[in-house]
């Protein structure tokens, strides 16, 4: 009482910051003591013999003989083929760097429980494309330096800034982020798709992902993979 409004704001911000740092420590200790990491993953590389692709994107295929690739008409079909065992992986363009991302492929990963396991950057006519391979199992290898996640965040002041601050507290850099609004419970909310420069199979990143799972409305891992460069 009697404090200047600007001092109240600064004091409140300081208290919030202390609480955030305290929660970070508590989540890390909880994970150590209870072994309660909420996601399972394999440490064995995926064996891919029957990849599937959208026919119009077959030209980007570099790692497989094109006559061995199953071609379909949509990403949804690729997802169905993987789930039915007709294909063991999908390949597609998830982003044209500096131009835009594929909403269809992001939706497929989020809704069909599919995971990026490889990422290559191709250049063609001055356009850089992120070409990803995805399977129905989350695989984490020591060489991986990227983690892609999707989380839901309510549309109120400070919600995303607190999440980004949390990620920063772990010393993690973001290499890509985009959002998409959706209608839920009579209000607009947001799905955020985030790529982080990190490896899941480390103590700090497991603690970060555990904290994200507790402090967002919903969290899903979309992949673990290696990607060269700053994109």
Can you say where each PLM-predicted feature lies in the sequence?
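Domain-level signature for soluble enzymes in the chorismate/prephenate branch of the shikimate pathway
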Residues: 1-231
